[in-house]
C-alpha cells in the first residue's frame, strides 16, 4: 500500500532510539523527509545520517523538550529545512514512574507540556499543509490502571484526553489528531531491557500478562503511527490506537 507520504515533511520528538527511531525510519522508508530531536547530539547526528542514506531530506538537533524555547527553535528550524510541516509526532516521555513531587513535575514538563508546546509551535505550519496530522504517543498506562499508576499513568491519560479535544478543535482546519498507546515495548537499551536485567521478577510478571508471550517491538508501534499520520488515514481523527497485542482488557 502506498501511504502517500513521499515528499511530505514529518517531525518526531525523541527520534534517536526506540519507538521514536522506528517511527523516523519508517517515515523515511515511505519517502517522507524527516526531522528529529533528542538530548544526545551524537545520537541525533548518527540517525540523521542514516535517514539521509535512504534518499530523503533529514535534519536534527539536540534538544531538551522540556525547554519551550529550545523546542520551538527546533520546530521552526525543521520547517525551514524541510520546507514546511505535514505531520508532527510527539513521542518523548520522561518515563517518570513514582509518586513524588519530582516525578510529577518531570512528567508534567516532559510528557504533557512538551506535547502542548510542540502542537502550539507546529500549528502555523500544519495549517498550510493539505494533509496535516498530529500524533501523540501515549501508553496503555493511560488507558488502564497498572503498575505505572501515579505521575506516568496520569499524564498519559491526560494526553489521550488532550488528543481527543484537539481533534475536535482542529478538524475544521483540516488537521487530524490521533493518539497511539503502546503496550510493553522491548528494545536494546530500553526500559524493559533494564527491568529484565535489574528486576527480573517484575519482568517475568509483565511477560506473563502478555497473551502473545512476548513484548512488542518499536517497529510494530511505528507501523500504527505512520499509518495514522498518512493521507491514507484521512477519515481517522480523534482515535486512540492501542498497540498492545491484546494486553489490555478494557472495552
What label would you give each PLM region?
Residues 119, 155, 163:
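Active-site helix of classical SDR
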Amino acid at each position: 500500500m502506498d501511504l502517500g507520504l513521499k515528499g511530505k515533511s514529518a517531525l518526531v520528538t525523541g527520534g534517536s532510539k526506540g519507538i521514536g527511531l522506528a517511527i523516523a525510519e519508517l517515515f523515511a522508508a515511505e519517502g517522507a523527509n524527516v526531522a528529529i530531536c533528542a538530548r544526545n547530539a551524537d545520537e541525533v547526528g548518527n540517525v540523521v545520517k542514516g535517514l539521509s542514506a535512504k534518499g530523503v531530506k533529514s535534519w536534527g538537533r539536540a534538544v531538551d523538550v522540556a525547554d519551550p524555547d529550545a523546542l520551538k527553535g527546533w520546530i521552526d528550524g525543521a520547517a525551514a529545512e524541510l520546507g514546511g510541516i505535514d505531520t508532527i509526532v510527539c513521542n518523548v516521555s520522561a518515563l517518570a514512574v513514582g509518586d513524588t513531587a519530582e516525578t510529577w513535575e518531570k512528567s508534567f514538563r516532559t510528557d504533557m507540556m512538551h506535547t502542548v508546546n510542540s502542537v502550539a509551535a507546529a500549528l502555523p505550519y500544519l495549517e498550510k499543509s493539505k494533509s496535516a496530522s498530529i500524533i501523540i504517543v501515549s501508553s496503555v498506562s493511560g488507558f488502564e490502571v497498572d503498575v505505572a499508576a501515579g505521575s506516568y499513568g496520569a499524564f498519559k491519560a491526560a494526553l489521550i484526553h488532550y488528543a481527543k479535544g484537539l481533534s475536535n478543535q482542529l478538524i475544521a482546519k483540516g488537521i487530524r489528531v490521533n493518539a497511539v498507546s503502546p503496550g510493553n515495548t522491548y528494545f536494546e537499551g530500553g526500559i524493559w531491557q533494564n527491568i529484565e536485567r535489574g528486576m527480573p521478577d517484575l519482568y517475568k510478571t509483565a511477560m506473563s500478562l502478555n497473551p502473545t508471550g512476548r513484548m512488542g517491538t518499536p517497529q510494530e508501534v511505528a507501523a500504527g503511527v505512520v499509518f495514522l499520520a498518512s493521507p491514507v488515514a484521512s477519515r481517522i481523527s480523534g482515535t486512540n490506537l492501542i498497540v498492545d497485542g491484546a494486553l489490555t482488557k478494557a472495552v
